[in-house]
């Protein structure tokens, strides 16, 4: 349903809408090629994010010191970057994974929605995402 809405919104752009839809989805309708492209992009996005993090770490840790937080002109009082910020980053990542593990392994349904267990009816739009009546012309 979301892909259909995106397709309809993109196709409403004058002159270039159809070209944008075909570029994004591979066609106007949501079919197997669309789903393959969607899954491929969502598979690649975490790796892109990890690459950006590594580029950030290389750029930040490659310098001699911090960004001079005290505003001192000389290098004598500058803080070394690696011992403080790397440890802080590692502690933060460790705490994040502990909290994530608690939710995943001990409370898997804590952040879920009870409607996830309702059998789906493909012929009916779920009530939670039915658009307001005044938006219907844009989705048609």
From Swiss-Prot:
It is a multi-pass membrane protein. Its main location: mitochondrion. It is found in: Mitochondrion inner membrane. Binds 2 heme b groups non-covalently. Disulfide bonds: none annotated. SUPFAM superfamilies: a domain/subunit of cytochrome bc1 complex (Ubiquinol-cytochrome c reductase) (SSF81648), Transmembrane di-heme cytochromes (SSF81342). One of its GO terms (biological process) is mitochondrial electron transport, ubiquinol to cytochrome c. Heme b b566 binds at residue 56. Keywords: Electron transport, Heme, Iron, Membrane, Metal-binding, Mitochondrion, Mitochondrion inner membrane, Respiratory chain, Transmembrane, Transmembrane helix, Transport, Ubiquinone. InterPro entries: Cyt_b/b6_C, Cyt_b/b6_C_sf, Cyt_b/b6_N, Cytb/b6-like_sf, Di-haem_cyt_TM. The chain crosses the membrane at residues 38-58, 85-105. One of its GO terms (cellular component) is mitochondrial inner membrane. GO terms for molecular function: metal ion binding; ubiquinol-cytochrome-c reductase activity. Heme b b562 binds at residue 42. Belongs to the cytochrome b family. Component of the ubiquinol-cytochrome c reductase complex (complex III or cytochrome b-c1 complex) that is part of the mitochondrial respiratory chain. The b-c1 complex mediates electron transfer from ubiquinol to cytochrome c. Contributes to the generation of a proton gradient across the mitochondrial membrane that is then used for ATP synthesis. Heme 1 (or BL or b562) is low-potential and absorbs at about 562 nm, and heme 2 (or BH or b566) is high-potential and absorbs at about 566 nm. This is Cytochrome b. The gene is cob.
């Amino acid at each position: 349903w979301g892909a259909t809405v995106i397709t309809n919104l993109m196709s409403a752009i004058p002159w270039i809408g159809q070209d944008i839809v075909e570029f994004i989805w591979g066609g106007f309708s949501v079919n197997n090629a669309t789903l393959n492209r969607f899954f491929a992009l969502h598979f690649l996005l975490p790796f892109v994010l990890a690459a950006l993090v590594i580029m950030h770490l290389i750029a930040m840790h490659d310098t001699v010191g911090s960004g001079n937080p005290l505003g001192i002109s000389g290098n004598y009082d500058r803080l070394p970057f690696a011992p403080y910020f790397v440890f802080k980053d590692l502690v933060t990542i460790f705490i994040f994974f502990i909290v994530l593990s608690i939710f995943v392994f001990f409370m898997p349904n804590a952040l879920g929605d009870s409607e996830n267990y309702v059998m789906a009816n493909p012929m009916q739009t779920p009530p939670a995402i039915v658009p307001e009546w005044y938006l219907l012309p844009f989705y048609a």
